Amino acid sequence: MKQLYRYVLMFVVLTLCSCALALQAKHSSIREDFEKSMKGYNKLLRWRDIEGAGMTYLDPELRDAFLKSAEDIKKRGVTITDYRILTSECLPEKKTGEVVVEFDYYALPSNRIKTLTYRQKWSYLDTEEKKGWQLKTGLPPFD
């Protein structure tokens, strides 16, 4: 009887450990996807593919307003010269992430470089249609 109890206990412990490892691996994968998404989005903004950034990463409900802002930014001649990711926080268990980015930019006809801080809120979708990170905040005002 004692022997059976030990085997059952060992089985339960091993099962719990394997579940914990599987969850940790899933969270690691979600973190890697977050890193890729937030870097990809900001890189597209940097290289003036604002519409592509919005269509790829933005929540569909926010796209119309985003595209209007993108059009306004292009009309005003705003050019992003550099960006720095100041902080990024990914919370896989809550399926949320937050990024603080600093952009250096100028708006024609001025050649003066300005700096803007942009706080981005992200959420992770895990549905049959789509898995991945979506941006929940629109473009900042490039004054």
Protein language model annotation of sequence segments:
Residues 91-143:
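Exposed beta-sheet edge and beta->alpha loop/turn motif
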Residues 35-36, 50-97, 111:
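Short solvent-exposed beta->alpha transition segments
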Residues 40-48, 56-60, 125:
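Structured segments of extracytoplasmic/periplasmic soluble domains
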Residues 13-15, 74, 79, 129:
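Short, structurally constrained coil/turn elements
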Residues 19-47:
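Short, low-complexity N-terminal intrinsically disordered segments enriched in polar/charged residues
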Residues 8-18:
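Bacterial N-terminal signal peptides
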Residues 1-8:
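Bacterial N-terminal signal peptides that target proteins for export
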